[in-house]
Amino acid sequence: MKALLFTIPLLLISSLNAKDVILDTTTSLVWQDAPINKDALVTYKEAQNYCKFLTIDKYKDFRLPTMRELQTLVDYKNFDPAILNGFKYIESTTYWTSTVFADDDSEYWTVDFEKGSRSVKATYYDRHFRCVQKLK
C-alpha cells in the first residue's frame, strides 16, 4: 500500500525582530500591530497620512491595505474579533482600506473585525486602521 503525503497550506504568521510588526509569510506582507491599531479612531485621510510617514525599525513605506489585503487577516472561525491568531492589538469594529468605493473618492471600503464583513464608509467618519507594507 502506498502512503500518500498531504500538505495542508497554513497561514504562517510570525513576529519579526522589530517591535510592533507581524509578518504574514503567505502573502509576504508586514503588518503593523501596535496599541494605536486598537486605540485610535481617525478619518480616512488621517489614517492614510499616518501610514505614509510610519517607520518601525527598518520598515518604512507603509500604507493602508487594500480591501483584499486586509481581508486576508480575517478568520471566519473566530468571532469578536474575527482575526487570525497572533495579533495583539485589535478592536472588533471597522478598519479602513485603501480601496475606493466605485468612482466616488469620498467613500472607501472597510473591513469589520467583529464578523469579517465589509462595508463602505464616508472618509470623514472615524475608524480604526492598520498599516501594511510588502516584505522586501
Predicted stretch roles:
Residues 19, 93, 126-128:
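Short hydrophobic/aromatic beta-strand or adjacent loop that forms the aromatic wall/cage
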Residues 48-61, 67-112:
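An exposed tryptophan-centered "aromatic clamp" motif
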Residues 115-120:
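Short, P/G- and charge-enriched loop/turn segments at secondary-structure junctions
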Residues 18-62, 110, 131-132:
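Extracellular adhesion/carbohydrate-recognition regions
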Residues 4-13:
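Sec-dependent N-terminal signal peptides
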Residues 121-136:
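Short, structured beta-strand segments at or near domain termini in extracellular proteins/domains
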